[in-house]
Amino acid sequence: MRTLAILAAILLVALQAQAEPLQARADEVAAAPEQIPADNPEVVVSLAWDESLAPKHPGSRKNVACYCRIPACLAGERRYGTCIYQGRLWAFCC
């Protein structure tokens, strides 16, 4: 029973350690709100990320345009994650 409690504590510490950088990023985004018209269903987002997470397009070295869209990505785009803007979930599409 002690072993189970110790393993659970280690798991909780590991999860908390991973959550702190994500919370810091969310705080940075929340600190700089942008004014976007309500009638615009498309939001342009500029992000910095690890190269390993960048979209891979074979044979192309050009910059890739990424957008946060509702409800889904357009034809030819791929969903790479989720954006949270004004309390709503958006598809992060490139």
Curated annotation (Swiss-Prot):
Residues 1-19 form the signal peptide. It comes from Pan troglodytes (Chimpanzee). Residues 20-64 form a propeptide. The lineage of its organism: Eukaryota, Metazoa, Chordata, Craniata, Vertebrata. It is found in: Secreted. Pfam families: Defensin_1, Defensin_propep. It comes from the Eukaryota. The modification Phosphotyrosine is found at residue 85. The gene is DEFA1. PROSITE patterns: DEFENSIN (PS00269). Disulfide bonds join 66-94, 68-83, 73-93. The modification ADP-ribosylarginine is found at residues 78, 88. This is Neutrophil defensin 1. Keywords: ADP-ribosylation, Antibiotic, Antimicrobial, Antiviral defense, Defensin, Disulfide bond, Fungicide, Phosphoprotein, Secreted, Signal. The keyword Secreted applies.
